[in-house]
Amino acid sequence: MANIDEVRNSLESKSLKVCVVGIGRIGLPTALSFAKAGLQTIGVDINEKLVNSINLGNFPLKDEPGYEEIFNKVKKDGNFSATTNINEAISKSDLILLSLPTPMDKKNIPNYSALETVCKQLTDILQPNSLIVVESTIEPGFLENNLISILEGTDKLHVGKNFTIGVCPENANPGEILHDFTNLPRLVGGIDEQTTKIITMIYDLVFSVELVIMPDCKTANAVKLTTNVFRDVNIGF
């Protein structure tokens, strides 16, 4: 993904290879959305039972209307598969989406261990010129101050030189994911202007919703958290 023209060509030819790390409640529908758009997509998860079941053709999210039909189609078309082998999946991918849990602990402090663990793994296996998009909900500044530091930790990766990164926070409620993925606006922010444009171009192909361009990753994550707070307050009343 050296430039926008290359990305545009890879989208038109459907040659862009996608890896979604974390295929749970949000990650699996995300992966299916990219596969439905005609892009070769592989989902990675540490849950071996889940991966095996998916590869046998069993859709696990029975309470998500509309997705079982999509699942069956992309499986039949050969556009989606799952694996526990992150090394193999990343080595074949151009776009890596991180859809990992960031739960709150008993002190209401977010647990980013899943994201941090995966980023440590990526330092040795990420392909040159790959794009990482963090869909998980994270606090403003965590990507810039923590995740990039981890990715660059072995001195093999250098953001803006041999990989790039951005965010497009997921925006969906359990049980209504297909509706939300096709109706609710998404925030987009990249580490630089070109990355933001590339992410926007990709997501515009996959999701038929308004993409709201943010000036940077930190702002996108801040707006996402503000939206979550607003929603929770409304639910509370």
Report residues per predicted region.
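Gly/Ala-rich phosphate-binding loop of Rossmann-like dinucleotide-binding domains
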Residues: 31, 35-36
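N-terminal Rossmann-fold NAD(P) dinucleotide-binding loop
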Residues: 27-28
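Conserved N-terminal Rossmann-fold NAD(P) cofactor-binding segment
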Residues: 2-17, 40, 46-94, 102-109, ...
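Rossmann-like NAD(P)(H) cofactor-binding subdomain of soluble oxidoreductases
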Residues: 104-171
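Short glycine-/small-residue-rich Rossmann-like dinucleotide-binding loops
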Residues: 100-102, 137, 192
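Glycine-rich Rossmann-fold phosphate-binding loop(s) that bind the pyrophosphate
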Residues: 23-24
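Internal alpha-helical scaffold of NAD(P)-dependent oxidoreductase catalytic cores
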Residues: 149-166, 172-237
